[in-house]
Amino acid sequence: MRYLLIVLAFVFGPINTDCVIASEAEDLHQYYVSYFDGKWIFEQDGTETVIECEGKQSYNHCSGFGGQLNELWGYDPVRKAWAGHGRGGDKVWEWVSDQHKGDAIKAGVSLSNVGKLWHPDGTEVSSKQLYTIIDDNSFEVQTWEQQDGQEEIVEPLVRARRVQ
């Protein structure tokens, strides 16, 4: 009987863990994609850029600049967080989102990401972002960047609005 219990623990333990991970991944996917899915206009320093985010079954794909910028967002089971990896121009980056609070992204919610940006020369830049949700159709993003041993740089504020 003892061997049967040990075998059952080895068989059903991983299955239960996979169910918890799948549930957490689905929750994060629903939380982020339900808000960010769609076409957005990002405005920074008077320049507007269209970014389109398309929710897929288990991830979110964002693109802009005629396909020159691409990001894939999805559940990272190692970090147990919503994470994004992207490439645009000659740079590559990754972001990891903080744990979400509440059932939905709505006005007044703040979201934060931490990440890294890599330049072609190998320079690595640490970054953090703060998203402030204004309403169902607009948000602002403040970004800070810092290279090793240098002062933190505050990037100009980005305002995003959903294309109706």
Write out the residue ranges for each language-model feature.
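Residue-level recognition of beta-strand termini and adjacent short loop/turns
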Residues: 121, 135-137
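Short hydrophobic/aromatic-rich beta-strand segments that constitute the beta-sheet cores
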Residues: 42, 58-64, 80-86, 110-113, ...
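Edge beta-strand at a domain terminus
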Residues: 138-164
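Sec-dependent N-terminal signal peptides
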Residues: 4-11
